[in-house]
Swiss-Prot record:
InterPro entries: ATP_synth_F1_dsu/esu, ATP_synth_F1_dsu/esu_N, ATPsynth_dsu/esu_N. This is ATP synthase epsilon chain. F-type ATPases have 2 components, CF(1) - the catalytic core - and CF(0) - the membrane proton channel. CF(1) has five subunits: alpha(3), beta(3), gamma(1), delta(1), epsilon(1). CF(0) has three main subunits: a, b and c. It is found in: Cell inner membrane. The gene is atpC. It holds the Pfam family ATP-synt_DE_N. The lineage of its organism: Bacteria, Pseudomonadati, Pseudomonadota, Alphaproteobacteria, Hyphomicrobiales. It comes from Rhodopseudomonas palustris (strain BisA53).
Length: 135
């Protein structure tokens, strides 16, 4: 399988840089997979789990929003936060979800709608993490 260059950058660090076979990205308009020679695209990413596939191995990384750009140079993801699933503190993540639920009471209108949408994304990540841990 042909490879391409992938960079995952967050404000704290360069979370990943290297040649990969495929990257599955949680897009705001739907998840999408990137392979070598993918058409150029810029997409907003939602909070979710980004999957990097190299030589049959998968690495899962939690991203909490950002931008993905596919160009002739490869794929670059600028993520608000990027944490490997292996390094994620599940208890702290659960506490964040709980705090987000509590904060809903003080919101209304479009602010409430955005908070519910973000909470749904976080709960989906939490569900995927729980399902992964069981296997």
């Amino acid at each position: 399988m042909a490879t391409f260059h992938f960079d995952l950058v967050s404000p704290e660090k360069l979370a990943f840089s290297g040649e990969v076979d495929q990257v599955d990205v949680p897009g705001i308009e739907g998840d999408f997979g990137v392979l070598a020679n993918h058409a150029p695209v810029v997409a907003v990413i939602r909070p979710g789990i980004l999957t990097v596939i190299t030589g049959g191995n998968q690495q899962k990384i939690v991203v909490l929003g950002g931008i993905a750009e596919v160009s002739e140079k490869g794929l670059t993801v600028l993520a608000d936060v990027a944490t490997s699933v292996a390094d994620l503190d599940a208890a702290m993540f659960a506490q964040t979800v709980s705090s987000m639920e509590s904060a809903l009471a003080g919101k209304q209108g479009s602010e409430l709608d955005r908070a519910i949408e973000r909470l749904d994304h976080y709960k989906n990540i939490q569900h995927q993490l729980t399902a992964t841990a069981m296997h």
